[in-house]
Amino acid sequence: MSTKKVYSFLSQAFIFSAIMLVSNIIATHLPIPMPSSVIGLVILFSLLCLKVIKLEQVESLGTALTGIIGFLFVPSGISVINSLGVMGQYFVQILTVIVVATIILLAVTGLFAQFILGKDDKEIEDTKELKVVNKGRKHGKVA
């Protein structure tokens, strides 16, 4: 029988609200503009990794919010539509920034992936070489 504890909607909402309150306070005191939602995600991720908050404590509300995420983006979409006049004036600049940022993002992601994969391949090769050397020593052969 499962002993998984079910947390109430209210307790989960309190956890999310407390994290958002703290992230709003942090965002107002930072010297650079940073969205409080990003700070909140970092705080939530950190608390989950450090096991201060258990996944069960926020899982069902998180799943519910993920289910309605499209609805949550409606206000952002409306504000973009309201800004089409401004965006039309700077279309070339906006398009240039989007294309350049996308290329930089792809390049950095690719280089980082190659670095990580190359590091793993080198560790595998080093491990294989070490096994061959150790195997030779067992049989009285020195490499």
Swiss-Prot record:
Principal cellular location given in the protein's record: membrane
Covalent S-S links between cysteines: none
Topological type in the membrane: Multi-pass membrane protein
GO cellular component: plasma membrane
The keyword NAD appears for this protein: no
Entry's localization field: Cell membrane
UniProt entry keywords in alphabetical sequence: Cell membrane, Cytolysis, Membrane, Transmembrane, Transmembrane helix
Transmembrane segments: 6-26, 30-50, 61-81, 97-117
GO BP terms: cytolysis; killing of cells of another organism; programmed cell death
One Pfam family in the UniProt entry: LrgA
InterPro entries: Antiholin-like_LrgA, LrgA/CidA
Function: Inhibits the expression or activity of extracellular murein hydrolases by interacting, possibly with LrgB, with the holin-like protein CidA. The LrgAB and CidA proteins may affect the proton motive force of the membrane. May be involved in programmed cell death (PCD), possibly triggering PCD in response to antibiotics and environmental stresses.
Family (UniProt): Belongs to the CidA/LrgA family. LrgA subfamily.
HAMAP family: LrgA (MF_01141)
Name listed for the protein in its UniProt record: Antiholin-like protein LrgA
Organism annotation: Bacillus mycoides (strain KBAB4) (Bacillus weihenstephanensis)
Gene from which this protein is expressed: lrgA
